[in-house]
Each structure stands twice: as C-alpha cells, then as structure tokens.
Amino acid sequence: MSNSTLKVKTKSMPDSRLAVELEISAKQCKESYQQALSKLSKTANLPGFRKGKVPQAVLLQQVGAKRIQASAIEKLLEVVWPQALQQESIEPLCEPELIGGFEALLENFNPDSKLTLTLETDISPIPQLKSSKGLTVEAEKVVFDPKKIDELIEQSRKQLSTLIPVENRPAKKGDVAVVSFEGKFTDNNSPIEGGNSDSMDIELEKGQMIPGFVEGIIGMNINDEKTVECTFPKDYPQEDARNRKAKFDIKVKDLKTRELPKLDDDFAKQASDKDSLEELRKELEAKLKEDAHQRSIKNRQEALLKALVEQLEIDLPKTLIEIETRNLIEQTARNFAQQGIDVKSTFTPELINKLMDSSRPEAIENLRRQFAMQALRKEEGIEVPNKEVDKKFEEVKKELSKEKNIDFEKLKEAVLEDLLQDKVFTWLEENNTVIETLPKTKSLNGKPSTQGKTSQSKSKKTKTKVEKTTK
C-alpha cells in the first residue's frame, strides 16, 4: 500500500483529548480494497475451485462485498493511524476511538472514493502555573514535648514486663485477659466473620478492640461469663459491619497483670545500648527533637505544595486518572497481601468498582501534585547535575548492599526524583512565605489560642520575625 502524505486535521477537546480527522485518498482506498480481495482469493475454499484459484467475481458473489470492504478498512486503520501520529508528532496515551463507529464507516466506504474518518485519543496535558512566587502559607510547627520521653520509656518497660497471674480480684484496666468469645450481629443474629475465638489474649486498654468490648471485660472475674453489647465504628474495615450493633458472649479464662521493671540503669541497659537511664533519656530527647524538626519541615513542604497546586491549571485526561486510580488500588492490594489477607477473594469485581470511584479524588490530587512540580521544574529550569545524582546513587547503593534483587535502574530513577523534589522545595522556600503556627493550647481564660512564627526567604536573603496569630 502506498504511504502518501495524509491530510490531517487536529482539534483539541476537553480533558486533554485530541480529535484527529484523516482524509484517505481514493488511491489508498482502492489499493487496500484490492489487497484485501487478493488475500481472500488466495485463501478461500469454495466447492469446484482449487484453493487460490477462485475468480474475484465468484468470490464477491459468495463472500459478499461488505466482508472485503471491512478487511480493507481494518488494514487502512492499521496503516494510517501510525502514519498520522508520526506526521503530526502526536504521542497518544491510549488506543484511539473511532468516532461514529465501525459500522457507519463501513456503510460509507467506497473503494473508488476518498474516505474521511475521525479518531480520538488522550494526550499528555500541558500544565501551567498562574503563579509560583510570593505565595503565603501556614504550616504547623511540631514542638518537642518532653512528656514523650516518659511515654517511650513506659512503652519499653511494658515490652520488658513480666506477666503474672491475678488472684482474688476482677479485671481492671491495664490487665491482660485471656478470653473466649462468640459474636453475632444484633439485627439478624447472624455470626460475625472473624468474630469468635477459643482463646485470645486481650490488652485491657482503650482502642485494642471495637468500642465497648474491653470496657465489658473490665470488672469480670476468672470463669465469669457475660454478654457484651458493642457497635462497630463507621470506619471499620469490614464494610458490612460498619455502624452495626453486635453482641459478644465472653468468658474470662485467665487474667494476668504486668510487673514492670524498675526504672534504673539496669533497665536502660536492657532496653538499649546505653549504660545509664540518663544517657537513655538524652538519646530519646535527641531523637524526638530531630523527629519534631523533620515533621515541621514536612508540614512546611506540604503547605507550599498545596499552595502551588492551587495555582495549577491543567486538563487531566481520563486515561491518566484511571491509571493512577488503578495504581492506588494495586498498592492497597499489596498492603493487604503483606498482612496475610487473601487478595483474590477480597478484591471482588464489585469491590474494585467501588474502589475505582472512591479512589478517584486521591488519584486526581496525586496527578495535580506531580504536574505542579513538573511545571515548576520546567519554568525555573530546576535540574540536578549528573555528578550529584551519581554521588547520591552510590550512597544509597552502599546502604542497600545487603539487599537482594534490586533494580538499579529504577533505584537511580528514584534517587533522581528525590533530589529533584528536594530542589523544588528549596526553591519554594526561597521564593515564598511560610507562617509557622504552634499547636492550639488552652489560654488562661480556657479558650484555644495559637502562637506563630513567620519565616520568609527569597533568593539568598532570609528574613525571620516572631508574631502572634489567632486562628
């Protein structure tokens, strides 16, 4: 088939969709038709004729012109679409859609006449930023809380504690109860999936089970039996259980309490590589301060990126939204698999359809963030020198030296992406204003109040001042 220049017209559509109108010459149509007819005549088996020797007139009569025309059109589409993409430098994101449908095109096809058809496809959107400088945002400053040191130490004491039997008293908060239970939904008395056990150790602390379960056990003695009424939370993972009332027949089989180790240097040696409790506290303080610092940085970055995304103008194509949505669902499935959940039985077609709808807003937000950063990098020429990438790549490789099955090509791409992101956030910090607000606290009159710090840096200048703000 000849590969003459196509007549191509393009028209931009909503959602970054492109309509491509193609005018195929009568010569190409005739060639495609003749080739389809010739190919079929060589393979057709008709009574009274040898294979490949069927006259074309007989073939048309027996097979029908429409079948040959359909083959001719299919071949034309295989040829002219890639030709149009190359000719017009179009990079499609998906397979094209034939506007009007194949049947309508077949009805209008005449091998002796030119053929005009329209194909639509999604293309990459063009992101534009209305502004990227002089923005003012608020971000919560994470403050180091000395109480966290004691909380971490208590957690460690709990982990190193010894469980000892409880005698002559009922269960109380902080105990560990060994219970058997069977649960049913109150509305139809049906058993709850996973709602029973012959023996389970339960920490009698808030948040360990659904609301009401632990509270129902507190006050029971060993061998006591009791029916406890509970209500499943509205955000419970098992969808059919959300907001439903349930009753659990519970029996306390055993009761234990924790004997905590003494808070001394011996405990510090057991809980860490430090020789004294004072050294342990200093180490925890340093880690908590660094954690607060990093979380503050993260809050600043998130606030700046959110403001940048608000300045983004983009027409996202449905193809990209669907791909990102599926990526989110696949990530959820991987997380479930890591928890030992049977993904195949859990992710039914019905659930996947629901997740496609519920995950769509997050997918759109993810794409907007990606394109906002991409647009800023392009506008401001933000790049990472190869030497810097190579240096960081070698550092990461060294850290992962004991890991197996590493895709180093993907690893290097991830390193580059991280470095680019760091440079984008550095640029945003230097060219915009971040007001850091402290967490809300109770003032003397009992009303919530906040204090804030404004830090602004542009280029190499840094300006910092402290001011009070009230939200």
From Swiss-Prot:
UniProt keyword annotation of Isomerase present: yes
Polar residues compositional bias, start-end: 436-446
One cellular-component annotation, GO: cytoplasm
Keyword Nucleus: no
Protein's cellular compartments: Cytoplasm
Enzyme class: isomerase
Domain PPIase FKBP-type: 174-261
Amino acid composition bias (Low complexity), ranges on this chain: 447-457
Enzyme Commission code(s) on record: 5.2.1.8
Family: Belongs to the FKBP-type PPIase family. Tig subfamily.
NCBIfam families, sorted: tig
Function description: Involved in protein export. Acts as a chaperone by maintaining the newly synthesized protein in an open conformation. Functions as a peptidyl-prolyl cis-trans isomerase.
Protein name: Trigger factor
Source organism of the structure: Prochlorococcus marinus (strain MIT 9211)
